[in-house]
Amino acid sequence: MAHVNHYDVIVIGSGPGGEGAAMGLTKAGLNVAIVEKESSVGGGCTHWGTIPSKALRHAVSRIIEFNSNPLFCRNNTSLHATFSDILGHAKTVIDKQTRLRQGFYDRNDCTLLFGTARFIDTHSIAVMQNDGTEETYSADKFVIATGSRPYRPSDVDFLHERIYDSDSILSLKHDPRHIIIYGAGVIGCEYASIFRGLGVKTDLINTRDRLLEFLDNEVSDALSYHFWNSGVVIRNDETYEKIEGTEDGVIIHLQSGKKMRADCLLYANGRTGNTDKLSLDVVGLESDSRGQLKVNRNYQTAVEHIYAVGDVIGYPSLASAAYDQGRFVAQAITKGQAENYLIEDIPTGIYTIPEISSVGKTEQELTAAKVPYEVGRSSFKHLARAQIAGKDVGSLKILFHRETKEILGIHCFGERAAEIIHIGQAIMEQKGQANTIEYFVNTTFNYPTMAEAYRVAALNGLNRLF
């Protein structure tokens, strides 16, 4: 008789990657358990990352909209809110998402195991529960989907009450008047938008020479300008020498000799995979210096019955991609190999204020590859829908091949950019001659809409040809 604690597959981690894998496996008829170290499902994406930061950003953008609209803001009075005030909105969304995801497991008869997992042999794990008790479970196969956490350098005192990372910032109790954000990646830039939108004096320290250098240069420059225009102080090419917590704030000493002081500091420079507590050495696996695992096209690690997906395998480290990887690994386990793979051009959504989204090549990449491309642009300020909504900051840029008219890249900066991008992405994904900028000229768009930006940009680009 089969052991009661034995499963076909055990998934470790209930974030997007783990959820995608568990749902795919249970729907294929396998007996699946999923281990979650926290008290509720969803992983870092739901509780500390994507969901709360975007909920905070939405609340702040609505406050900005209210204060900039003369219909609402009269007699020179403005609506003010603190970080603590808007955290309530984020927690409401987190609770809704958690209940929704809990329902997925309940309806699909997927066993939930709460506790911290570690391997004890190649086919068994021990799960340490909150009360200190440990239970052993075995499986034919495992999927590691433990995600990542903020990188914490050893010389920074994260126990100090004024020094935070992107997880602990959600437990911010006081209301700072001045914040230093160290690290100007996606997370750092998003939180810079949030805090500056709340009227908090914000210093953004960038270890690179430009913001989000993987973006198209024009988009990166646009973000830098809007940060500057809103009062964010950006310091590029800087590295900390020492971060010193004081009684009522933080002082950061930079290697360039500069010193800065603020009420608190958010350290947002890098992430590391959650593999250190898995006892990987027991099964013959080893993570790299970033805590990440290497996998093949079927998401198998060096141990063929142990798979890994999501942040724990590195690029692209996106919630959307992690869920797809989870679905693909379910195919690999049930059918011998994955039937689908991540698309080549994965869209990027960055929830700054204004929003940013890109898919495909940048101008600098096309120039370096000597591709004969042309540019089509549409400014939001010229769109009727943007004027009506008072959201006239931003633009859409389409990069296309001069000869074939093939769309090579799309870059959007402004309100709803992450939604707008998918219209162009759908055309880019078409095969052969179906991927053409002329589609947008020959298609009727609703009017007025933000989607009309595609028609305007297409006409603008085609008019440049000769």
Curated annotation (Swiss-Prot):
Cofactor: FAD
Compartmental location: Cytoplasm
Cited InterPro entries: Class-I_Pyr_Nuc-Dis_Oxidored (IPR050151), FAD/NAD-bd_sf (IPR036188), FAD/NAD-binding_dom (IPR023753), FAD/NAD-linked_Rdtase_dimer_sf (IPR016156), Pyr_nuc-diS_OxRdtase (IPR001100), Pyr_nucl-diS_OxRdtase_dimer (IPR004099), STH_gammaproteobact (IPR022962)
Keywords, comma-separated and alphabetical: Cytoplasm, FAD, Flavoprotein, NAD, NADP, Oxidoreductase
GO terms for biological process, alphabetical: 2-oxoglutarate metabolic process; NADP metabolic process
Keyword Transcription attached: no
Protein name as annotated: Soluble pyridine nucleotide transhydrogenase
Annotated GO CC locations: cytosol
Cofactor binding notes: Binds 1 FAD per subunit.
Its job: Conversion of NADPH, generated by peripheral catabolic pathways, to NADH, which can enter the respiratory chain for energy generation.
Catalytic activity from the UniProt record: NAD(+) + NADPH = NADH + NADP(+)
Sequence positions that bind FAD: E36, K37, E38, S39, S40, V41, G42, G43, G44, C45
Family label: Belongs to the class-I pyridine nucleotide-disulfide oxidoreductase family.
